[in-house]
Each structure stands twice: as C-alpha cells, then as structure tokens.
C-alpha cells in the first residue's frame, strides 16, 4: 500500500472544508490550520515530514513564508488563489507572495484538480537548486540563509520526495524507457523464432494452470505480459499464439473423441492477457501534468 502524502493547509475554515472533500481517501493526509501561530508551530516542529504546503493567498500567509525562506526551509507549495475579485483586492493592498521558483499558483476554478497538482508541485520542487532565488525579489525579503544545514534539508527532502513520487507514479514513464533494441520488430529472424517459441511455451503453461487452484497463474500472466510489453509485441502476434495452441488442442481432442467446446473457455485467458497488457500501457504512458524528465529523475 502506498504511504499517503502529508499535506499542510493554512486557510480559512470555508476553504479547509472545501478541500477536505477534495482530498477524501487514503492517498493524502491533510492537516489544516486557521491560526497563524499553530501553523508556524507545526512547520517548525517537523518540517521534514511535510510533503507539500497548501497556502491560501492572503496577507496573513506572507510572514511565515518569508520566515521559511530566510531560514532556507524550502518545501513544495501550492498557493491557492481566491476568486479574481478577491485576488485583485489582495494584490492592491499587500505585496505579492513569493516563496521559491518552484511554487505553483492555482486559481479557485482549478482547485478540484488539487490531487493531481500536488504531484506536479512535488515534481517541480525536485528541480530546485541549493541556492534558490525568488522571481522579482523585493527589498522586503532578505536573502535566504544558504548554509550547510539548509542545503542538507533541501537535498534530503528532494531525495525523500523523489522516492515517494516514484512510488506513487508506479509504471508511469516506463513506456518511454523501453529499449528499441529489445523490440520484437528489431530482432533477427533467429531471435524472433526463439522469442515466439518461449512466449508460446509460457502461454501453454498459463492455459494449463488457468483453472487450477495452485495460485501461480497470476505470476505467469505478469511474466508473459511484461515480456510482451517490453518487446512492444503486436496484439496480432498474441492472437496468433493463442489460435495456434487452440488448433493444437483441438486436434488432440478430436483424436480422443472429445468435444471441442471446452476450448471456448480458454478465450478467458486471451481476454485476461489483453486486459493486463492494456492496463500496463495505460499505467505506463506519462501524464501530461508531470514534467517529462521527472520520470528519469526519480530513478
């Protein structure tokens, strides 16, 4: 089971109530704060345990973010922007809130996408350098303390979150990590023959154990699907393997004087394998909301 992401929210209660409904489930653990002192105390206690900050865009948020920046305590963050009318009033009266170059500003109209945006915020955070500058830095924000402890904090956080993000992404990105030299279409004629013979042997074993109670068929299915996936094998090749084996079994049944109807049940094997393969492709193609190179950084 994946460990949940620990999110820390500083926002008014009406915003917190809305976000609790968005982060239902066991993929995220949301800690909410309305009082600035409580929020600061939580951040200073165990900042390394926080996976992402969610901060409502208002003047009250500025002091604590300035303090974190000055201390070199940089964390993934999403700034929740209120409606345009409320935001206009805020920016007219207060300085712009900036924390670091990897922060994400999310308008209220897109708050429903927060579970996905959290992953993106963490992915952006992984690219922060030890010396992080602010865009359009104002004179009211002193330069950060760049010492060994702050650099160590950033690097340790990035390493921890990279592992956590990789755990959550699973097979995502594997699609583009496959080696063309391992693709079936690039095999030599002899390699193709040996590969298909091996795959056909595996398929036979799956069929013979599919309706047994030994509990090994899932491992056999996974092994077969993995080989087909990384060889970029065409579905037509799998269908051909299935039909050849069914023809072979049909001949045996005829010689024994038995009905061929039993072979119809083995269509379930083909459906199961194609479903597994389709799911692997679905899970492996990178999501558009995650920067492409993060799939390689989390290796």
Curated annotation (Swiss-Prot):
One of its Pfam families is KaiA_N
Q: Which residues form the KaiA C-terminal domain?
A: 179-287
For the null mutant, the annotation states:
A triple kaiA-kaiB1-kaiC1 deletion grows normally under photoautotrophic conditions in continuous light. In a light/dark regime has strongly restricted viability and impaired growth behavior, and overall decreased pigments (after 5-6 days); phenotype is more extreme when grown on 0.2% glucose.
Which GO BP terms, alphabetically? circadian rhythm
Q: Describe the location of the KaiA N-terminal domain by residue ranges.
A: 1-169
* Matches recorded under InterPro entries: CheY-like_superfamily, Circadian_clock_KaiA, Circadian_clock_KaiA_N, Circadian_clock_protein_KaiA_C, KaiA/RbsU_helical_domain_sf
Location of region: Flexible linker: 170-178
The reply to whether tRNA-binding figures as a keyword in the UniProt entry is no
Which keywords label this protein? Biological rhythms
Q: Where is this region: PsR domain, binds oxidized quinones?
A: 1-135
Q: What is known of its domains?
A: The N-terminal pseudoreceiver domain (PsR, approximately equal to KaiA N-terminal) binds oxidized quinones. The KaiA C-terminal domain mediates interaction with KaiC, homodimerization, and is responsible for the clock oscillation function.
Q: What family classification does the UniProt entry report for this protein?
A: Belongs to the KaiA family.
Q: What's this chain's function?
A: Key component of the KaiABC oscillator complex, which constitutes the main circadian regulator in cyanobacteria. Complex composition changes during the circadian cycle to control KaiC phosphorylation. KaiA stimulates KaiC autophosphorylation, while KaiB sequesters KaiA, leading to KaiC autodephosphorylation. KaiA binding to the KaiC CII domain during the subjective day yields KaiA(2-4):KaiC(6) complexes which stimulate KaiC autophosphorylation.
Oligomeric state and interaction partners are given as:
Homodimer. The KaiABC1 complex composition changes during the circadian cycle to control KaiC1 phosphorylation. Complexes KaiC1(6), KaiA(2-4):KaiC1(6), KaiB(6):KaiC1(6) and KaiC1(6):KaiB(6):KaiA(12) are among the most important forms, many form cooperatively. KaiA and CikA bind to the same region of the KaiB(fs) form and therefore compete. Interacts with KaiC1 but not KaiC2 or KaiC3. Interacts with itself, not seen to interact with other Kai proteins.
Q: What is this protein called?
A: Circadian clock oscillator protein KaiA
**Coding gene?**
kaiA
